[in-house]
Amino acid sequence: MSRQKKSKAVPVVVFLTILIAALAVLCFLIKPLVIEPQKDAIAKANADAKAAVEERNKKAEAEYKALIAELESEHNKPTNPDWPEHDPSKEWEILDLSNIPLENQTAETRTRADLFQYGNEMLLVNAWHSRPENDFNEAELKSVSKARSGDQKIQAKDNNVLLYPKAIDALELALKDAKAAGYTHYMVDGGYRSYKTQEEFFNARMEKLSSKYSGEALVEAAKKEVNYPGTSEYNSGLGFDLRLYDRNDPDVGAPKYSTTPEGKWMNENCWKYGIIFRFPQNAWPLETSTDKSFKTGVSVRLNLYRYVGKGNAAIMHYLDLTMEEYIEYLEEHPHIVLFENGTQKYEVYRQLVGDAPSFDVQLTRSTQSWETSLDNMGGLITVFNY
């Protein structure tokens, strides 16, 4: 019985085997006719899609480059058609826009207290323009030596050397780049002096001269050696002395500061950080320096620097102007723009506000980056950064 079942199963197995073999052969024969063309079609579709994407990317990249070129071209042109043409080949150029208003003009209200809170970087303090005592704010003055720590710490004579934060920030950047160039050992030897401290210095000088002079002659004699209280650059909170010092090597501070590589580097580069050398004289601190004591009223050689802001410092540097001369320049040219290597860098606008307790600062919508400062000569100087 089992033999009969087995004999009947054999043909079925053989049949199935033949069928499977036939299907395999059929698949083998069909593959080049159906499957391969499908694979080729899919591969071609993928290649076409990839090529289309690459083409779109190339087109988009070309459009992007064209747009950037157009924007750069527009950026290098005066934004106002009334502006005079500038020469993009020049390292720097200043255009006088005094008869042209600010473009896309707007305004924001400020008070004198607002500007005095953090130090007016363009506040002129000299023998003819004393510090406005009723407005001056000492609250934001900071200790130079305590303002930073670690590698950023600034060396100062002691913890009582004070400056406004914006001056400390600028000095920190300058010292960082000086260090990268191989120049170190700078020390802030003097900073802010209060009215009371300056008064003590002045009275001490008068006492010393009292054996030779009296009355008004005594006051005038003392003024030649020590600034009258409120008229010293040290009263601004933005002026500071520099010298070299290393407590482990007294020879570091032996040479005259201005003759050292460190002093020369600082005097040549400080303007890039918004800092100016305050009282230049003939061939001092640099061989190219011209005597400006007739403008500053200071003929004593002091290694004294003053923070005025990058835009103001750049223009003073290019035009070789002191603060006094720069403000006089802006009185005659109240709206100017500075181009560096063909690119608009700073725009400066001076408006008259007098002694008003509050005023509308005239602004342009062309940039959101700006700083404004009273100049102690009835003006408000606003610098727009581009």
Give residue ranges: language-model regions.
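Extracytoplasmic cell-surface/polysaccharide-interacting catalytic and binding patches
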Residues: K5, P11-G191, Y195-Y386
